[in-house]
Amino acid sequence: MMRTWMVYVVGLVGELYGSQVEETREMREMKEALERLFSRRLSDSEIEMVESLEDGGNFETRVLVPVIFHKDKVVVSPAARYRDIEKEERVYVEEVIRRLRSLVWHSMVYIYVPKNNDWIMDLICEVLEMSSPQRLDDVALYKDTGGKCGMKFVDLVNKMFKQNADMLIKFGDLLSNGAETRILELPDSLREDERRREVEMLQRVKEYGKMLCTEDKQKEIVEAQKIMCDACEQIWRREEDRKEFTMEIYSRYLNMKVMRGGVERDVEDPLIDHMDHYMLISTHKKYKCMDVVAELVRKVFVEDKDIEDSDVMSAVCSVRERKRLEEMREMEERKRKEEERAKNEEELLRMVEREEREKREESKGRGKKKRGNRGAGESKEESKGRGKRKRGNKGAGESKEEDRGEEGGVEAEDPLEEMAVGEAWRKKKGSGEKRISEEHHYKVHSRVLRWKKDAGEIKRELDEGYEKKWKNRSIEEIKEQKKVHDIVEVMKLLRDKEKCDRFFVRTGKYMKGKSERWKMVANGILEEGGEKKVGKVEVGLFKGEGGESVVYHLMFRPTETERTGRVGGSSFGKYDDVDEIKKEKSSDMFGFRYPSGVRCEMTSNRNEFRIEYRNRKNTSEVLRTLTILRIPET
């Protein structure tokens, strides 16, 4: 899990600092850049990972994510055609498309090789300049409808991969020969161990170049990208999957922006992600089911991890369970329709029987003996009178039915005055009455509320508590943890259903510790002392004994702890590191106030919810700021 993140970050560092530096200085600057990004010193395991990249390089396979972002929204989805793009975004998209072929080429051939990156990068650019197919106008290609509806974005990406594949033989041959030349040119002054490492590294480059010349490798690169495009298109069809996927893309763009010191780029290229081609292709061949592949891609992408056999099986199980639930819902819907149809048929039968009975009674009345002329006249007049009276009564009856219908309409609106919807309620919007937004109701577990207290009291509670992972922590550690856990003001955002749905994604439910649990996740930025950390705001919930939703976990998880797996794994994963939740006191937070002198200001708009934590002795001093960002528009 950690490796993909570190490779990704090393790529960013290379972008910032370039590769034309000595190894020792390169290593030092890389570590310093990472520590600035993380706002802390690197751990031993992280330093070891950076050093392993320097020692072994990176030859991992990659795929391109077929999505174009502009600021905080998706402007081109996998299946988008040019005509689908908003007019005000088309100039931006066209600029991205012009750069896309170069990005595709780099994703196909780029490798990270310490002390050799200069000539390899020059070679990548040189081959692209020499061999790019006839300087194709990719924008015109994407815009061209050819009398039809035009090509999808994934079709454009796949076409570029196929066209660029023709350049792999030339690049592979030059790369292999270049590595061989450098082996022969190694200076005699090198120590034996240094020479051995250099030869081993260049030998790997040489073998990689030869492999690119093979038809099998060329097919693998193109096929893996085709599967990735199909998977992303499938992900886009399910709203919950699409939200998670775009949130993770947005999170990575935010990280790159922080890495650049907050500098906005004129154009953000689509992301390149490390993904095992062999596992991707073999899963597709084995299951022949794009639902399984899409679930696998979604899982490893949002959890930022390498594909493992367990991930494949998890994807298979998730798809099977989803289909089982869909079949159950379809069966219930069919059953409901059948019952409704039977009920309608029964009602229709009763109506027919009633009409036939009325006809028989009417027929009997006409069969009575006729009276004399006078009697007939009187009968006729009486009949007319009765007819008038009858029609008059009928009109009255109709009027009553209409009145009842109007009354029914009023009654249908009455429940809106205060309607319970699961765990939500709303009030009817009346004339001159301010609309009250629908609310969620939660209880907050004491393990969340403890972080409101001072560090010393928190430490005493944790040392005496039942959660082993929190025992014997230093005061310094507790203070650091308080910064990311003492964010109970987020509950204000959670309670407002409309806002909550705009900022938070709900993950699937899972069972742990005899309780049904689930999460809500949002992108966020924590700022303190001029340093910014990108991460996820996590809310962990379970069902209480009374059926209420109880918040047992609330924190801001910085990206580096999520990706290194140091605290509970991915925010989107269907698991957590809380083994047991004791039946302790929970609060609905009604009337909650911090101690006197502490001030916390909250502001919000459609795009962000901002919490400023201030110094209790000097409220003009902002200690830290948590900004929660809305789910990107798709």
Curated annotation (Swiss-Prot):
Biased composition (Acidic residues): 408-417
Compositionally biased spans, kind Basic and acidic residues: 354-365, 397-407
Disordered: region residues: 354-438
A matching Pfam family: DUF3654
InterPro entries: DUF3654, UPF0329
Similarity annotation: Belongs to the UPF0329 family.
Name of the featured protein: UPF0329 protein ECU07_1850/ECU10_0050
